[in-house]
Swiss-Prot record:
LysM domain: residues covered: 71-115
Transmembrane segments: none
Protein name: LysM and putative peptidoglycan-binding domain-containing protein 2
Compositionally biased intervals (Basic and acidic residues): 196-205
UniProt modified residues of type Phosphoserine: S5, S24, S33, S57
Amino acid sequence: MADSSPALSLREGGPRAPRPSAPSPPPRSRSGSESEEAELSLSLARTKTRSYGSTASVRAPLGAGVIERHVEHRVRAGDTLQGIALKYGVTMEQIKRANKLFTNDCIFLKKTLNIPVISEKPLLFNGLNSIDSPENETADNSFSQEEEPVVAGEDLPPPSPQESDVQPVQPEEVSARDFLQRLDLQIKLSTQAAKKLKEESRDEESPYATSLYHS
């Protein structure tokens, strides 16, 4: 009994051996997580969202090649926010944001609405020069000057020699005497033709009459 007491005292009150701890997972690199978040934000920025009741998509923010202008729309009795958005090709949220509307029925609290219409500038095919360059502006101005109509009363350039040589055909002047002579000639010819036709018809009827007489 005396021999077993020290062993019991060691088991009950003695210091215990430390347990082996589980290996901790390797720390995740912050650069990898940041790159994933950046890719996710870019993919969300590229996606186009559509709102209910509108065919227009949310376009890119204003920058190169995009112009935003406001069109004034007069509110009428039968207008709806959805119909106005479809008419101008914008979203209902854009109209609400531009006019500070809280609900769809708030459009009747205003007489006019500002519609934000976004239009894109057409760019050249190479993508290096836009329509707004000075060269294109001069080309547009020259093209518009060519299309200007000629105002009545302006001095026209003199006609070319070829055009001046071509003169319209003047109607032949007929005197009263010539006119009467031509009229008499036509009457004479008509009378002769009628007399000839009458003689031919008489000659055709005469054999038929003699045959009836002899019969």
